Amino acid sequence: MTERTYLAIDLKSFYASVECMERSLDPMTTNLVVADASRTEKTICLAVSPSLKAYGIPGRARLFEVVQKVKEANLKRQRNAPGYRFTGASSSSVELANNPGLAIDYLIAPPRMAHYMEHSTRIYSVYLKHVAPDDIHVYSIDEVLIDATSYLKRENITAKDLAMRIILDVLRTTGITATAGIGPNLYLAKIAMDIYAKHVQPDENGVRIAELDEMKYRQLMWTHRPLTDFWRVGKGYEKKLESIGLYTMGDIARCSLGAPTDQDWRVKWNLQDVCYIHVRKPGGLASGNHKVQVIFWEVASYIPPFLDEMRMKQEDDPEDPSNTREMIIV
């Protein structure tokens, strides 16, 4: 079987970056949040710019959390201000770094989904300059998965070179930067992008590129917590795993559970071999408006063989939390 190489590319704080570029502001140094301020402060922020996240604000915060975090940061900042007083405010992280007398400020941009879709279409056209449409799987408005195997061989380049080439083209075309993950399967490429890339030092353009293979995944990801950081692992899934003493991917990998032919656990835990996701591409993507089928193997298929063999042997009803599970360590 041919060894394959996949790229996962995620546009950094996409909605916030689009709004910054529309205002001729640097997406990496401008404090901006995308939210409908006309609603209550409980409204969810669709995006938070990287410089604003630096104050401990999560990407999907509610607006009141942004207000609270910035207020707390300003209280600390005021202690170092000349005369303990602010002389102004700024939403630029560069200005704030150079002038301790300025209070932290931020911009609130109302969401414009149709506008973001237009930008996504434009960026997709950039991808098509480097990769054929059959090798691009559109995962979301700001994220794609790419089979890079044939391009690396044909052009005699590394996966990192190809990822950087694509990302820099997007940056030149739109002013928006991105993060990339590289792996021998889609799962590892996405985990490299979602988790490992956050620990990689960004370059001068804010680009982060991370690579994971099976051995590196064992070394770096088996002890990572929380489990909800992993692709397709939600709170409910995490809670069920913790109820039987599994807190990390390493814990899961060390358990061989149930008979090899037993599919009951996979179905109940939503770990079917294949998941077909039907999406409609917006105008301008590939050959126009048509329905396409994007296939994503779920965690049970993506995960390396040593973890993919995980099973659960249950003597009684698996839905009953009082039942005992037989854990077989391998």
Predicted segment positions?
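Gly/Gly-Pro- and Ser/Thr-rich, intrinsically disordered tail segments characteristic of DNA damage-repair
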Residues: 1-283, 288, 292-318, 327-329
